[in-house]
């Protein structure tokens, strides 16, 4: 599978090429921007459950993955208690799938090898349109507030004081599907500061937020655009000395990672999956220890809650055209 986008993300999505088994005879139905493998009859912008019962799945083992913002091994331990809760609630075995890239995660869901996932905020639209991902939840604080900001960071002793100073420098981004790691900063730098990629600054890609952050800490990168949710968690874990970096820009608040399921998952199983999320006991859990500002999972409406991110995609020329 290849994505044709005005922002070329061939490298980021190379894992989509040469997938088989999912592209069956296509149904003539409303689908909006969804890939031709899916239908959207109710207009919620996500893929409907297949009308053919043979395409509905109820696996004996559920595969779960979390967006690869840092070393997957770190988060496998963080999610262990949640996975046990998911097993208890669904009555299924659950396996954690440690993905190394966003593209690998989307590919796994599209090809039927991933059933439940936490997908990076900026990648939700891509996963929805091209992998049949149906987001239904995100983390929120006890008072129901949620979200994160994009920050541009530099080494503490850098001569770069504000975004306009980035002209003529290299900026580290994570990958082309990331909202805070690429799409939002690209749009903001162009719209608010008149800085265009390749014309005014040289973009480089680190692959993940932690790579970008540590690259600035170690002065491998002159600047980096990152999600401050990841940044703050790394600071809280004392992964690095926060005195070694400085923030020169902080954006408006964006929705954070979306949690969802494969569109063809059995509806009765989906209800159990949702129950496992919304009734998960946060108090004393590893999730509470890692995501300290969060206190629960709350329902989301992809059509409404991701509108701002789809607008950023539109502004930066992203088109969800899957082949």
What are these language model-derived features?
Residues 121-132, 185-191, 215-218, 222-242:
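A ligand-binding cleft/hinge motif common to bilobed small-molecule-binding domains
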Residues 103-117, 130, 164, 209-229:
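Short helices/loops that flank or line small-molecule/ion binding pockets
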Residues 93-100, 198-208, 246-249:
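Short beta-strand-to-loop elements that line the ligand-binding cleft
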Residues 64-87, 122, 145-214, 229:
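Bilobed "Venus flytrap"/periplasmic-binding protein-like clamshell domains
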Residues 67, 142-151, 239-277, 292-312:
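Periplasmic-binding protein-like
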Residues 10-18:
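Bacterial N-terminal signal peptides
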Residues 107-165:
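Acidic, polar ligand-binding/catalytic clefts
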Residues 2, 23-104, 289-323:
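N-terminal hydrophobic or amphipathic helices and topogenic motifs
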């Amino acid at each position: 599978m290849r994505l044709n986008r005005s922002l070329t993300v061939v490298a980021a999505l190379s894992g989509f090429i040469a997938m088989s088994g999912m592209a069956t005879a296509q149904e003539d139905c409303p689908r909006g921007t969804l890939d031709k493998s899916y239908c959207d009859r109710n207009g919620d912008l996500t893929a409907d459950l297949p009308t053919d019962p043979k395409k509905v799945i109820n696996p004996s083992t559920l595969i779960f993955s979390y967006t690869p913002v840092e070393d997957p091994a770190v988060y496998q331990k963080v999610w262990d208690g949640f996975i046990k809760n998911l097993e208890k609630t669904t009555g299924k075995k659950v396996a954690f799938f440690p993905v190394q890239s966003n593209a690998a995660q989307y590919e796994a869901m599209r090809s039927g090898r991933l059933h439940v996932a936490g997908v990076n905020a900026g990648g939700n639209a891509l996963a929805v349109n091209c992998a049949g991902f149906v987001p239904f939840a995100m983390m929120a604080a006890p008072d129901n507030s949620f979200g994160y900001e994009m920050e541009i960071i530099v080494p503490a002793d850098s001569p770069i004081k504000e975004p306009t100073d980035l002209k003529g420098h290299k900026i580290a981004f994570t990958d082309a599907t990331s909202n805070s790691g690429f799409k939002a900063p690209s749009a903001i730098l162009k719209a608010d500061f008149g800085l265009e990629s390749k014309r005014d600054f040289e973009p480089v890609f680190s692959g993940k937020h932690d790579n970008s952050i540590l690259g600035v800490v170690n002065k491998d990168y002159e600047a980096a655009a990152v999600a401050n949710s990841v940044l703050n968690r790394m600071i809280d874990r004392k992964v690095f000395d926060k005195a070694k970096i400085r923030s020169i820009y902080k954006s408006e608040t964006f929705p954070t990672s979306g949690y969802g399921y494969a569109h063809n998952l059995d509806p009765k199983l989906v209800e159990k999956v949702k129950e496992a999320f919304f009734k998960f006991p946060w108090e004393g859990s590893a999730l509470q220890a890692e995501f300290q500002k969060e206190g629960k999972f709350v329902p989301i409406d992809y059509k409404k809650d991701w509108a701002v991110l789809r607008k950023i995609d539109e502004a930066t020329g992203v088109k969800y055209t899957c082949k």
